[in-house]
Amino acid sequence: MSQGSQVHIFLGAPVAPLKTTVSQGTASLMSTANAWEKVRLFYKQHSLYLKAGDQEFKNLEDCQVPKGLGPPGLLSGDVLTTSVRRSAQVDEDFKHSASEAQSVKSQVNLSDMTSGQMCGLGDGVQHLPEEEKDQKLQCKNKKITDEQSKNQSDPCVRNFQRDLFALDLKCAAKLDLGCCTEQMSTGTKPEPTGHRERQSQESFSDTRCEPQSEGAVRKASDQRLSAEAEFLSVLTSSQRAFLAQGNDKGQDCINKSTVNMEAEPTGSQGVRRTEGDFSKPGGDFEEESENEQSQVYSLELFSPVCPESESSHSHINPGKNLENTSSQELFSNEENLPPNELCSSHPSTANRSWSCKDDSHHSKALSEVHQVSKKPRMDSNIREAAKAVPQRVMSELKDSKKISLIKNCDSKNQKYNCLVMVLTPCHVKEITIKSGPNSGSKVPLATIVVIDQSEIKKRVVLWRTAAFGALTVFLGDIILLTDVVLYEDQWIGETVLQSTFTSQLLNLGSYSYVQPEKYSNVIANVILQDLLTYVSTKHSYLKDLPQRQPQKMNTVEFVELEQLQPDILVHAVLRVVDVTVLTEALYSYRGQKQRKVVLTVEQAQGQHYVLVLWGPGAAWYTQLQRKKDSIWEFKYLFVQRNSILENLELHTTLWSSCECLFDDDTRAISFKTKFQKNTSSFVKISDLATHLEDKYSGVVLIKAKVSELVFSAAAAQKIALNARSTLQSIFSSLPSIVYAGCAHCGSELETDENRIYRQCLSCLPFVGKKIFYRPALMTIVDGRYNTCVHVGSKMMEQILLNISPDCLNRVIVPSSEVTYGMVASDLLHSLLAVSAEPCVLKIQSLFELDENSYPLQQDFSLLDFCPDSRKLWSPGLSLRAEGTGGIPGKE
């Protein structure tokens, strides 16, 4: 057998019982000598091969797909051939399949497919002249139409068409999904030195997009975006959710801002956002607002080779930033803001503003968004001007943009503006430049496949900043691409359209809901209506795509993590379990490098989710680390699906906020009630006598009194605290029950003859030092039964209400002489007193039994602690310091 994956296509199969087989009349057209002849599709190293009987075709494009079997909307074979011809690249010299080539049609009448022979278009991908192509297509379409009329009345054919329609709809929506999320790298072919844009173009031409069978073998790290690109993707997606608000059609978006891009001398790009350009042209407000806002928020949109871009955007006014604006203020004037367009990118030395249209909930923005000005100065005149679409920007588009059909884009020295429909959207990926002065830097890249009324499919390559504009488009969207150029990819022999530094992307929305009159001042109604007519005729299946519903900002709700949906904004009350800083995941924000901060959060015990802190949210790290295991309320989080792990993750946005909840807060009480309900089935509740008799190994809740605490100090010295210990003796023992240890592993550090701490050799090069409480052996008593429980350093700190051991000598307030050590001593004295109330202890027990079930060894470890059993308590949520960062609570 041949190596590699094989797809067997049986020709001439009987009608019953398969639903998708053709009628007997159609099958009779096949040769009856070999009723079950097979066409084998071999996946080999360099291409896809077909073999029919003894005939072998050099390429998948040589085998024609029977178009007569498709539904009327698929007669052109666009979706069928696209879904069949998934790109598969495994080597540098692999050629892209015909689904991405320039207007390659693979059409054949079913009657032409005789036994042992199939007609092809020749070897490889053919680029025919437009006139010759049109003549051939007309001739073949005529034959297909005749055959279609014969087969249309047959019920079996209709069943086949229906199933094929559903299949192609799915394929069209998910085409190239496996390749979209893969990180791409440039090839090793030689390239001429010159302009960086040229170098990037050639690096794209040799990118590899492996099939899913190969992608499953690849490491996930090879497919991940860099932290920089991931940050910008999340930023874009969250802004799409922020802007995707409008009327019942989901077309009009709130006017947020326009984007001004500046072309760097080396070709790098940065984002500068100004408050809406709908103000009076040339007025003081426009000029002052532009200068002010561009300095406040300058986000570098991926220029790894231009360090001066960071310095040029590093002038930030810390007093004027969006994260300092409350969420209520941020969205208070939402309903009063006018509809406007979602923006992509437009750099120019003159800071020419522009804007484009987003359609609905699923559209995404490249630019950062300003909902409210840092200084609310939108007077009545500006509000009146803001109620209409910015006429200056729209007239600029109208005056300077001449729309061309794809078939007329034939000159490499000219910029074109194309009104097209999206056939294949794509995620943002990255390529790594392997040679030249920019070697090692990564460039964001996205590729979409579009079509217009000239019936020519064309790949559009979006580079750098424009690549994130691909996140704003979806299957069936009508978009206006401006200032794109023709580029001939010499590596694969294909011509594509690619973005330039002045390219714009105007999304008119899904073709079923586009209203031409709204864009009459930008796009001629005749051109737009012509495209809509073509799409409704040739791609009518897209009409069944569900309408994307916008999300209103005033309807953002608190959600349960189990009910998360992707691509929406949510509020959530969460318990922070862990905080991790990824030191190697760096991205640029406000002119500085920031590390990616990942939180592990939960709403039910053991059900962990990921919350990533981006941009301004990274500043919460210190607070969250200090109050870990507390309950927090997060607002305006964006839900995104991880393309590698396929799980849902939470991401902070520019409008996110967080608040640590006190234990007596109604929101915290409600959270604890749900948490306790979710965890009650996992924890066994027992008394000490029953537990010792059952010899149960596991996690149990036991109600008992603490009678003694024994600390093992240095030099084999033991410090025992019990009911007979006085408050003064406990206070004097505090220096002995703390020690200086390695901040990484917690082991106690020794001192040399100069009383200098020695380094922890096992943790080098980490040399941090931290003060810890010594572990203790706690004796608990329940009636006449008692046992010993091991208490770790962290649990001792928790028992003392999170009073840090390094602040025992500090006074609580400057005017008082009461120190935290006095408070800790009083807590221990009250806990060990004879009159003390029993405590609820969460214990991990382990029994080692012999053959007679006699305990040879028993071990107990304290997992959680609640000093007052009368209070509402849930496992895993003991009494914490209430918003004081280690300061005792209200008790």
Swiss-Prot record:
User: Which organism does this sequence originate in?
Assistant: Mus musculus (Mouse)
UniProt gene name: Shld2
Q: What Pfam families does the database record attribute to this sequence? A: OB_SHLD2_2nd, SHLD2_C, SHLD2_OB1
Q: Name one GO biological process term.
A: telomere maintenance in response to DNA damage
Query: Per the record, which residues fall in region Mediates interaction with SHLD1?
Result: 695-866
Q: Could you list this entry's UniProt keywords, alphabetically sorted.
A: Chromosome, DNA damage, DNA repair
Please state the protein's primary subcellular location. Answer: nucleus
Positions of the region Interaction with ASTE1?
A: 1-542
Q: Give me the ranges of the annotated region Sufficient for interaction with SHLD3 and MAD2L2.
A: 1-61
* Family assignment from sequence similarity: Belongs to the SHLD2 family.
GO CC term, one of those recorded: nucleoplasm
Its subcellular locations are: Chromosome
Q: Where is this region: Disordered?
A: 184-222, 260-294, 333-357
Biased composition, class Basic and acidic residues, residue ranges: 192-222
Source superkingdom: Eukaryota
DNA repair keyword on record: yes
Provide the protein name: Shieldin complex subunit 2
Tell me, in a sentence or two, what this protein's role is. Component of the shieldin complex, which plays an important role in repair of DNA double-stranded breaks (DSBs). During G1 and S phase of the cell cycle, the complex functions downstream of TP53BP1 to promote non-homologous end joining (NHEJ) and suppress DNA end resection. Mediates various NHEJ-dependent processes including immunoglobulin class-switch recombination, and fusion of unprotected telomeres.
Subunit structure and binding partners: Component of the shieldin complex, consisting of SHLD1, SHLD2, SHLD3 and MAD2L2/REV7. Within the complex, SHLD2 forms a scaffold which interacts with a SHLD3-MAD2L2 subcomplex via its N-terminus, and with SHLD1 via its C-terminus. Interacts with TP53BP1. Interacts with RIF1. Interacts with ASTE1.
Residue spans of biased composition, Polar residues class: 260-271, 342-354
